[in-house]
């Protein structure tokens, strides 16, 4: 049974940082993506323009890239999942 939040390990190779973050399972992946990216960059004092800088969320163990309009609960993201945030070029 899934609660309303899961704890995932977020990995940002572009800034060499990793964080464990709770995310709501009822939100769409694009919204979770933007919120996490903004929070991580703000915590590190790095300016980011979310309109210009785009990131994709990729499952580290499976290589699956999550599409934007899928609720987290409908993905394979569960407690302990490692998600790599890759900057799009």
What are these regions (language model features)?
Residues 2-89:
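Ubiquitin system architectures
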């Amino acid at each position: 049974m899934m609660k309303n939040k899961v704890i995932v390990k977020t990995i940002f190779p572009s800034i060499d940082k990793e964080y464990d973050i709770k995310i709501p399972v009822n939100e769409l992946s694009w919204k979770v993506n933007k919120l996490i990216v903004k929070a991580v960059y703000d915590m590190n004092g790095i300016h980011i323009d979310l309109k210009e800088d785009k990131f994709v969320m990729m499952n580290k163990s499976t290589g699956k890239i999550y599409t934007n309009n899928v609720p987290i609960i409908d993905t394979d993201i569960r407690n302990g999942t490692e998600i790599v945030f890759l900057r799009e070029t």
